[in-house]
């Protein structure tokens, strides 16, 4: 069993505790999983990190979910900024890696939006603006209706 899979197991078990109504035990398991197998030892991946973020949100520990989400997001931003500096053939060689990192950041972005994490969205919006993303393409946390949804009259 790889260390990454072991970390995923903590999140799976924690979610089961949430479904059973024991959020305290779920948070304890999530904390233990990150303590025993921290991101400094096991690099962030969507598979071994998103379940922890979701678990914290589901268990009623949004601050812990936000902290982990932003830590992973900052890690992705560093990679993205690094790969954006590559030019020519080197740039071509890292294109798929850059796309993968952007997709991971997008998943975090949409998770934050889905969970209604306004402060996190605001921070991620600031970063997306540095990449040249237009304002109308961003999710605005202060608006009750996203720009890509339709209001149906009653």
Regions found by a protein language model. Give the residues of each.
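C-terminal luminal/periplasmic domains and tails of membrane-associated envelope-modifying transferases
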Residues: 1-154
């Amino acid at each position: 069993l790889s260390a990454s899979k072991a970390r995923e197991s903590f999140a799976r078990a924690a979610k089961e505790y949430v479904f059973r109504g024991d959020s305290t035990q779920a948070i304890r398991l999530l904390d233990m999983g990150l303590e025993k197998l921290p991101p400094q030892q096991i690099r962030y991946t969507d598979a071994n990190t998103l379940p922890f973020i979701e678990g914290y949100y589901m268990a009623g520990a949004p601050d812990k979910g936000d902290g982990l989400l932003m830590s992973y997001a900052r890690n992705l931003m560093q990679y993205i900024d690094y790969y954006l500096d590559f030019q020519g053939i080197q740039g071509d060689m890292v294109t798929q890696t850059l796309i993968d990192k952007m997709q991971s950041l997008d998943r975090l972005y949409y998770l934050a939006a889905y969970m209604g994490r306004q402060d996190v969205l605001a921070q991620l919006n600031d970063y997306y603006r540095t990449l040249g993303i237009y304002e109308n393409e961003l999710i605005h946390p202060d608006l009750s209706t996203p720009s890509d949804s339709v209001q149906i009259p009653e």
